Structures are given as C-alpha cells and as structure tokens.
A protein has these predicted regions:
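Conserved redox-cofactor binding core of oxidoreductases
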Residues: 61, 69-70, 110-234, 458-459
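Redox-cofactor-proximal catalytic regions of oxidoreductases
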Residues: 51-144, 398
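FAD cofactor-binding and catalytic pocket of flavoenzymes
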Residues: 68-82, 86-89, 117-118, 296-416, ...
Length: 526
C-alpha cells in the first residue's frame, strides 16, 4: 500500500486549488483523476476543437467508465456535462466568477424556502477575495449597484461592454433595468505568468492561458515536488477503520484488472457533486451500510441545478455580435427580487459570442452541400439576433436526488441514477424569467423573440447540493468546512456542499470554500 499525507480524489478546480495550497505548505499530496491528461496551455485543443471542429476521443472516457441514468424533467445529456480530464470541467468553462449574495445563505430565514447555510457571507467574504486573486479575476463593482460588499479590490480591471452590449445597456437604462460588466477569470492585462486576453472569443478553449484553467496551478503544485497526479485512475471506494477514521482509498488504473490501496492521513473528495456522491455510496460497509457519510440519509439528496432558459431577440439593425471576446454584460438586478419566496432570483445574461459550430451548423442545408456563400448568409443573419439567457436559482425537492443505478461500469460498480423533477417554486421562477424576457424584448425594441419552454433548460454544468453542509447528521453530510460528520479526517468539498444555489455561477464560491477548508486543515489537522 502506498501512502501520502493527503490524498485528493478529483483534479478539477476545487481539488487543484487545495493541492496547490497544500503543496506550497510543504505537505505531500497525491491527486487521483479518473480522466486522461489534458495538455496545458490548451493551444492543441484550440486547433482541434475550434479550427477543425474535431472532438478528440483521447480526452473522453469510454461509456463503461463514465455513464449515468436519468429520469424526470431534465432533458439534456447530463453525463456530457461532467468533463473528466486532468483539470476537470474548468478546463472548458466560460470563467464567469461571481459572488453569491448575503441573502443567498439564509433563504429559509428571509424568504421561507430552502434551508440556511451554517455559515454567512461575512464568513466567506475574505476567501472570495483570495479566490479572485488566485484565478486572476477581471472586474469592477462600480457599475453594479447590486454587488455584495467586498474588503479587497479585484486583481484586474474589468472588460468594457462590447459594442452591442453598450447599445442594450442604454436602452435598458431608459426602462429601469441596469446592465453592468461581468467579473470573469480572464486576464484584462498580463497576470502572473498568464498573458493578457487577446479577445479570440473562444473562451471555452483558450489557446494562450488568458482564461483561467486549473492546470495552471496544478503544474505549479507538481513543480514543488510535493504533488503527484495519477491520471486514468478510478477511485472505487473509501476505507474506514474501526475507530471511524478514513484509512485509505481503493483505486484502480482504468486499464488494469487489480485494485490497490493508498493510505493517507487526510482524504479529500473533490470529484464534483455527482461523482463525489457516487464514491460515498460505493463506500458502504458494515459500519456504514447506506454509504459513507449517509447516517442521516442526506448523501445524494438536495440536488439542485441552475435552470438556464435561453432566448433569442431579432432586430432590424445589425449589432455585430462576436467582436469582443467573451461575455461582457449581465444584470444582477433580479437576483434578490421583491417577491423572492414566491419565486427565485434570476440573472439576466447577454451573450455577444459567436461559436464556430453555431455558424457552421446554424442552417438546414445538408453539410456536404454547404458553400462559402451559404456560410456568409448565415453570418449575415446572425448579425440581427442577440442571445439572452435567464439563469435562475432552483430549490431542493423530494424528486431531486442522486442514487445508485442498476447499471454497472467495467469494474462492476453501479453507475449513478439522477432523478430531477422541478418544484412548484421552480415553475414560478420560470414565469418570472419569462416576464423579464418580455420586458427586455420591449425595452430594446426587438421585433421578434423566441424563448424556451419551462422544461427546456440547461444546468450550465452547475450541479450542487448532494453532500450539503450543516450542523449535524440530522440535516447534512458535512460541516461548514466539508468534514464528514463522524469521520474527522475525511472531507468532501465543492458544489456538493451548497445548501442553496442562489442564481449566480457557483465556481468562485467553490474555490473560496476550498481555500477556507485548506487553511482549516493546515491549522487543525496537518
């Protein structure tokens, strides 16, 4: 059996954040990642995905290693939202880095729905600043009257509104709606060893490292000599000793037939809300027959997704979208609306981006018959359309959960089954989002609009709540630092800890929680 001081399951933005901080404290860390290596900087992926529209199978796991079953309202391919590579999902994210509101941490006390977190915004606020510094966030609150208080400035200045966003901001202002800039982990100027953004407009696959990728800090953790990464390695279960302490993890190389054990003083599970839940359920034993951390029955329960409903607006004039890099404009005016409690909060999100696959495939002409002229016609038509997204919070419910599937992977371990049915408050939030879409359409002078139906939403790859934090076994899986109740050296950290999702993108909160937990470990356990 091999050993280390700390073992981390998952190399995504949470696991990497913790590995980087621990390694720089002189602590030995072993990181186990189910997926393959993912080169950094991502210039190779840029050439493949953007220039050649090639989805390289070398960066995908086969179905007998990455799969889930799904039932309920969610009509998207939830499995494809889990990017299992070294670096995780934040290797291909949009880098939107937003703070939750203080109100988001106490929706039960303030509005009568959901549950309150065991910590407050003020407890997390200093760590939001540390997370922004780590990721190199460009932003300002000067144009956003709805931003929560902060004790430290953004490390980089904001990206100005794009040409089309500036036009919309003025039209919306005249109708009482504030459009402001978007904080994002994309470098407005050179930052540390990362160059300033060159506005390629392909933020999900940034070839130069201007858009933050966890691999940036994972490489630096490895350079300390204190961090080692095991790619293409599945962690199959966790082992707890007779005293209740986590003793080891059982892992297996994806191409090998024999499992092995790795012992550690502290084990951290940071594999995303879905896969972290699966690992706890697979770790059932005589001591924990329903799964590790599941003595109160909360593992896999309280699942929430963000509900993103997309719309398009058509105008007589040309707005020239796609001329200014990534996202620049949004409105947080409706994050904490007057009737919150009757419905949830909503982010009004504008996108000025154009994607290669939208241009090439945004036509009914068979692919083999497309000409350059047909592609130009598609581009011309796109100049008169603007995309808009209503990104909404959701609430936990009895029909939102993760459990073991009846189907099994190549090792014989059950896959996940995800059940997701919207709650009554979710449906009311859709109606509120639709009203906002109609307001924006009228205020900006659109002559046509299209908006998704209530069931046609995407999660934004935001999966939360399945190992939520709380005060004890009766209401949660972990405490406010991610430590599993009753298992003093086992932590689950990430979006799975969220008690409620709010409406803003969760990544900055996840990183802030990771930094806070790492400091707790160094002070108390290591």
């Amino acid at each position: 059996m091999t050993e280390s001081t700390v073992a981390i399951v998952g190399s995504g933005i949470v696991g990497t954040t913790m590995a980087y901080h621990l390694a720089n404290q002189g602590i030995d860390v072993e990181v186990f990642e189910k997926g393959p290596e993912y080169p950094y900087p991502h210039d190779r992926q840029f050439r493949e995905k953007i220039l050649y529209l090639y989805d390289n199978p070398a960066y995908r796991l086969p179905q007998d290693l990455q799969h889930l079953t799904l039932s309920g309202d969610y009509q998207r391919d939830l499995n494809s939202e889990r990017i299992m590579v070294v670096g995780g999902s934040a290797t291909v994210w949009q880098a939107i880095t937003l703070r939750m509101l203080p109100q988001d941490f106490k929706t039960r006390s303030l509005y009568g729905y959901g549950d309150d977190w065991p910590l407050a915004y003020d407890d997390l606020e200093p760590y939001y600043g540390k997370a922004e510094a780590l990721l190199g966030v460009s932003g300002t609150d000067a144009d956003n009257p709805f931003a929560p208080r902060r004790s430290s400035p953004y490390p980089l200045p904001e990206f100005a509104l794009s040409y089309d966003d500036a036009i919309f901001a003025e039209r919306l202002r005249q109708h009482g709606i504030v459009l402001h800039t978007t904080p994002q982990a994309r470098t407005r100027a050179a930052y540390e060893a990362r160059p300033g953004c060159m506005n390629f407009g392909t933020c999900r696959v940034c070839p130069i490292g201007a858009r933050y990728s966890p691999n940036y800090h994972l490489l630096r953790a490895i350079e300390t000599g204190r961090c080692r990464v095991h790619s293409n390695t599945s962690v199959r279960r966790l082992v707890v000793d007779a005293t209740g302490r986590a003793r080891a993890l059982v892992y297996q190389r994806n191409d090998e037939a024999t499992p092995r054990e790795h012992g550690a003083e502290v084990i951290i599970v940071a594999a995303g809300a879905l896969e972290s839940t699966r690992l706890l359920l697979l770790s059932a034993s005589e001591r924990h027959p329903d799964g590790l951390g599941n003595d109160g029955g909360h593992v896999g329960q309280h699942l929430t997704l963000h509900h993103l409903w997309s719309g398009s607006l058509h105008y007589k004039e040309h707005f020239q979208p796609g001329r200014f890099g990534g996202y620049t404009a949004r409105s947080h005016q409706f994050l904490d609306p007057p009737n919150r409690g009757k419905h949830g909060g909503v982010v009004v999100d504008f996108s000025s981006q154009l994607f290669a696959n939208n241009v090439v495939f945004h036509t009914d002409v068979p692919e083999h018959r497309r000409t350059g002229l047909q592609v130009v016609e598609v581009l011309n038509a796109r100049r008169q359309w603007r995309d808009i997204v209503m990104q909404a919070e959701s609430t936990p419910g009895p029909q939102k959960y993760v459990a073991r599937s009846t189907q099994r992977d190549r090792f014989g371990d059950p896959y996940l089954h995800v059940k997701y049915e919207a709650t009554a408050l979710d449906h009311e939030t859709y109606r509120f989002g639709r009203e906002l879409f109609d307001r924006v359409m009228a205020a900006t002078g659109a002559d046509e609009g299209k908006f998704a139906s209530t069931k046609h939403f995407t999660s934004g790859h935001h999966h939360m709540g399945t190992c939520r934090m709380g005060h004890g076994v009766r209401d949660s899986v972990v405490d406010q630092f991610g430590k599993i109740h009753g298992t003093p050296n086992l932590f689950v950290v990430g979006g799975s800890n969220f008690v409620s999702p709010g409406a803003v993108n969760p990544t900055l909160t996840m990183v802030a929680l990771a930094i806070r937990t790492t400091e707790y470990m160094v002070d108390r356990l290591l």
